[in-house]
Amino acid sequence: MAKLLSKLEETFDFDEDDSIEEYLKGSFHGILDFSQEDISIIRVAMQEINGESDKKLLISRVTDTIINKMEEFFKLQLEKGEIKNVNSKAISVMCFSIIFQSTILWQIYGNSADIDSDIFADDYLDIIFNGIKP
């Protein structure tokens, strides 16, 4: 578990000079490159949700690691004036959700996905930066 958390920390780590595009694309592709063993641990952690709630769930440790790193990144972007004044926690949770769900879909569809992961990442970033309204 410590190895997985360390790998997540590394995947979502950033340099102060990273652009938002570089960071989100790098994080997305970093997760897609996780081994089957890593994904299996996350899968087990997700099954744990229905279990006991009196202990810190494994999935909470996974999500907290990712969301905290992303929130730190977005707070820096706010300070630098790179993004408008938005709730850094909200944008972190939203981006985490998209990356996490995409990872699950890529695991399900594997090489049979009807879209290239680079194109998907570009489209995802386009929606974040430009929205869906005309």
Regions found by a protein language model. Name each.
Residues L8-E37, I91-C95, A121:
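Hydrophobic alpha-helical connector segments
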Residues M1-L4, S27, D38, V62-I66, ...:
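Hydrophobic/aromatic residues within well-ordered alpha-helical segments
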Residues F73, I127-P134:
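C-terminal alpha-helix
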Residues M46-E52:
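Short helix-capping/turn signature of helix-turn-helix
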